[in-house]
Structures are given as C-alpha cells and as structure tokens.
C-alpha cells in the first residue's frame, strides 16, 4: 500500500500489465521438451503481474466512490470480476478445444499407427495451448492499453446514506 500511495494506481497497473503480458507470451511457444521449472518461473512472474494490477485497480476504483456507495461498489466489483473471469476462461478454453480438435489426426490412424497418432494428438494439443496463450497475450495487450487511461482521483465527498436513491 505504501507503493500505491507513493506512485499511484496508474503506474502500478501499467507495470503489472506489462509484466503479465510479457510473461504470458512465452507460454505460446512451449514445446514437449520445455523444462517444468521454466513453466513454474513464468507462471510465478505472471502471478506477480496480476497482483500488481488487481490491488491498485481495485483500490483506485473504491477510492473513486463516495463512502456510502463502497459496499455497492465492492459487490459490483466482485460480480464483474467473477463474470469476466468466467467469460475469459470460456473463450480461452474454446480456442484451445477448437484448435486442438482441428489438428487431431484421423481416428483410423489410432488403429494402424498408435504411436504416430499419439505424437500428432500431442502436437495438436500443444497447438491448441499455443493459440489460447496467444489470445491471452492479445487480451493482455488490450488490458495494457486500457491501463493508460487510469488516473489518480481523490475520493469523492461523503453523502448522506439516504441520498443514494
């Protein structure tokens, strides 16, 4: 919170989105031979970027609300976060599934050459993951662009509780 107070939500969010996006892109290029430690480190960096985005954006949004609307703002924020997460997951899984399905070998290959089928199916799955992470990177770039529109606003003055109607 001291960093937030010192430099503001905008700079933290921009930095966090940059880290998140930069750490997402390498996932689009993973191979069967990629070491697990590389994936773990990339994932940890992504999570660090997410933490640098979520806290300042949420705090900035709550600071922009008058005190009597904070509970409603929190509820709306939590609802939008859950809905956006669900939609994002559905989109990425759809991309993964469709690209994988389109790249799968013919099923008769499973009977005639099971090892070849396995290799082609693995490559199709990897291509699905590559496509999904590429789409996630595009979402990250869009999110990064949006963070440039954040600005530091002071909290709104407190209104009477009954004035919300």
Where do the PLM segments sit?
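Intrinsic disorder in cytosolic terminal tails and internal cytosolic loops
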Residues: 113-122, 150-165
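Alpha-helical oligomerization interfaces
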Residues: 108-112
């Amino acid at each position: 919170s001291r960093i937030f107070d010192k430099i503001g939500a905008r700079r933290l969010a921009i930095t966090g989105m940059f880290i998140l996006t930069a750490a997402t892109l390498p996932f689009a290029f993973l191979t069967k031979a990629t070491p697990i430690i590389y994936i773990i480190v990339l994932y940890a960096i992504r999570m660090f970027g997410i933490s640098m985005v979520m806290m300042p954006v949420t705090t900035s949004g709550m600071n922009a609300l008058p005190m009597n609307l904070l509970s409603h703002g929190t509820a709306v924020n939590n609802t939008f976060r859950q809905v956006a997460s669900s939609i994002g997951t559905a989109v990425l899984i759809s991309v993964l599934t469709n690209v994988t399905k389109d790249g799968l070998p013919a099923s008769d290959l499973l009977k005639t050459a099971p090892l070849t089928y396995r290799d082609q199916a693995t490559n199709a799955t990897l291509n699905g993951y590559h496509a999904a992470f590429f789409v996630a990177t595009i979402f990250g770039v869009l999110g990064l662009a949006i963070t440039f529109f954040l600005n530091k606003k002071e909290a709104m003055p407190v209104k009477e509780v009954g004035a919300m109607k």
